[in-house]
């Protein structure tokens, strides 16, 4: 007799194999092994594609705000919290992958076909736990992805300003909003193969540029490292790191794009380990060199002298933020398509036109709240806490609370934690920690800091944290207080 879990995996593999053949045929990819440029650049679904997608999506503009977080936390806390939240995020990404496999296995046993349908997290929750969980997952996930897209637009405007300051940041936001709207033409995560690969290369360059440039620059005169100095700053910085390693709100969509999604289990962990090689050296080197000056410079580029190397890093980050905007927006496009009955449409142009209304509110919110840095912490505390930490942990406990569910589970506990009780204990710890530290203390600190930005700069700020321009006979304005 074949165990239930093995049967479930075989069913998913068989269905994925059919889907791969159908997609290849539809795209004109040859079956006899001949080289195809379309397949190389556009047709992604392997384990490597998923790894590049996870790693690329995890380290976008946060590279530039992590030094700011270090100035709030101090060096030791900054390093430890990165490792802690990185491992915690890998755990909940693993839980999401397990629940996806469970949901898909159950549905395929019922004869449900997912041809021309992308499974999403709220549908997994609906199938396993019911409509109330679906509503919670839909609300938190969509709101998080909405603001995740907003953050990418804000980051584009913030970065390009360090190359061309003839236009203010608000104007740059208008321009990049129009550029990023072209992501409506990318059908699904299958088609991010070349973009994910390039995106990770771009962030790798930027991270090592920050680390090396800071080391070469050396410590500024009179540098101080007073962090952590205030509770509100400490927990604001901590929630930015919580946000950094909470990029798996698109895990289900990435898994669904794989030919063999049951192989996803440890991909996010391996991606996180690579991300550590980028975030730890760059953030610590920048904080060592500039110290407390980072408290009023949330974008690391602002403290480094202009050079060809810096301009290259800025341009590469701009391209990568376009890619990350697409990553965050694509699940929103899917939700909208399903709501208006366009999800099964094969025409790329028709789907692109149907998706455009999603870009408008993102554009508008980026203009209202241009607070690069503080907005990351607020989103991390209020949305990421639930979307990618609390809800996956609770839903895993509830899905496997009965003995029969555990017996027939499509995925058994992992080798490194081979008991259901052990998994439940870890899940309870994650829920308690994130609820108290992430949402509670982090929410208080990040919202307090966010309100200060509004009080200092106002909504619709034309040029957030721009250096003051000198005017004859006019005193320079005081720098913003944090």
From Swiss-Prot:
Q: Which Pfam families match?
A: Aa_trans
Cytoplasmic-side positions: 1-58, 100-134, 193, 253-265, 335-355, 399-423
The UniProt entry's GO biological process terms, in alphabetical order, are: amino acid transmembrane transport; auxin-activated signaling pathway
Q: Which ranges sit in the Extracellular compartment?
A: 77-78, 156-171, 215-231, 287-313, 377, 445-482
Tell me where it resides. Cell membrane
Q: Which GO terms describe its cellular component?
A: membrane; plasma membrane
Q: Which GO terms describe its molecular function?
A: amino acid transmembrane transporter activity; symporter activity
Residue stretches spanning the membrane: 59-76, 79-99, 135-155, 172-192, 194-214, 232-252, 266-286, 314-334, 356-376, 378-398, 424-444
Q: What's in the keyword line of the UniProt record? A: Amino-acid transport, Auxin signaling pathway, Cell membrane, Membrane, Symport, Transmembrane, Transmembrane helix, Transport
Q: Does the keyword Cell membrane apply?
A: yes
Q: Topology in the membrane?
A: Multi-pass membrane protein
- What is the protein's major site of localization? membrane
Tell me which family the UniProt entry assigns to this protein.
Answer: Belongs to the amino acid/polyamine transporter 2 family. Amino acid/auxin permease (AAAP) (TC 2.A.18.1) subfamily.
- Any idea what job this protein has? Carrier protein involved in proton-driven auxin influx. May mediate the formation of auxin gradient from developing leaves (site of auxin biosynthesis) to tips.
Name of this chain's protein: Auxin transporter-like protein 2
């Amino acid at each position: 007799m074949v165990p239930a879990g093995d049967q479930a995996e075989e069913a998913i593999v068989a269905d994925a194999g059919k889907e791969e053949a159908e997609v290849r045929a539809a795209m004109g990819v040859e079956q006899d092994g001949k080289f195809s440029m379309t397949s190389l650049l556009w047709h992604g679904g392997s384990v490597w594609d998923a790894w590049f997608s996870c790693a690329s999506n995890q380290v976008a503009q946060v590279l530039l705000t992590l030094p700011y977080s270090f100035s709030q936390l101090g060096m030791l806390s900054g390093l430890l919290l990165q490792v802690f939240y990185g491992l915690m995020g890998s755990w909940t990404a693993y839980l999401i992958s397990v629940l996806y496999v469970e949901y898909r296995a159950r549905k395929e046993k019922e004869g449900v076909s997912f041809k021309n349908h992308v499974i999403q997290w709220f549908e997994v929750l609906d199938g396993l736990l019911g409509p109330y969980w679906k509503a919670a997952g839909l609300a938190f996930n969509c709101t998080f992805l909405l603001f995740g897209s907003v953050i990418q637009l804000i980051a584009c405007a913030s970065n390009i300003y360090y190359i061309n300051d003839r236009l203010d940041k608000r104007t740059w936001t208008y321009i990049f909003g129009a550029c990023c709207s072209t992501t409506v033409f990318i059908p699904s995560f299958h088609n991010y193969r070349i973009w994910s690969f390039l995106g990770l290369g771009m962030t790798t360059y930027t991270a090592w540029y920050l680390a090396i440039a800071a080391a070469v620059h050396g410590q500024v005169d009179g540098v101080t490292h007073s962090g952590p100095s205030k509770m509100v700053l400490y927990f604001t910085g901590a929630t930015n790191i919580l946000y950094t390693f909470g990029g798996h709100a698109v895990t289900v969509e990435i898994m669904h794009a794989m030919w063999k999604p049951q192989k996803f289990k440890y991909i996010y962990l391996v991606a996180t380990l690579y991300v550590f090689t980028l975030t730890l050296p760059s953030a610590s080197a920048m904080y060592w060199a500039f110290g407390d000056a980072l408290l009023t410079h949330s974008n690391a580029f602002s403290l480094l002298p202009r050079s060809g190397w810096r301009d290259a890093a800025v341009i590469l980050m701009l391209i990568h933020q376009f890619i990350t905007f697409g990553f965050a927006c694509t699940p929103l496009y899917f939700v909208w398509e399903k709501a208006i009955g366009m999800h099964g449409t094969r025409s790329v142009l028709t789907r692109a036109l149907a998706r455009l209304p999603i870009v408008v509110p993102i554009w508008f919110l980026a203009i209202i709240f241009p607070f690069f840095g503080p907005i990351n912490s607020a989103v991390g505390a209020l949305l990421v806490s639930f979307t990618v930490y609390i809800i996956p942990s609770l839903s895993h406990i509830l899905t496997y609370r009965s003995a029969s569910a555990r017996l027939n589970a499509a995925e058994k506990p992992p080798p490194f934690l081979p008991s259901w009780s052990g998994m439940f204990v870890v899940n309870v710890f994650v829920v308690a920690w994130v609820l108290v530290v992430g949402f509670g203390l982090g929410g208080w600190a990040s919202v307090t800091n966010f309100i200060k930005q509004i009080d200092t700069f106002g909504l619709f700020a034309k040029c957030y944290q721009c250096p003051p321009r000198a005017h004859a006979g006019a005193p320079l304005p005081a720098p913003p207080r944090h």
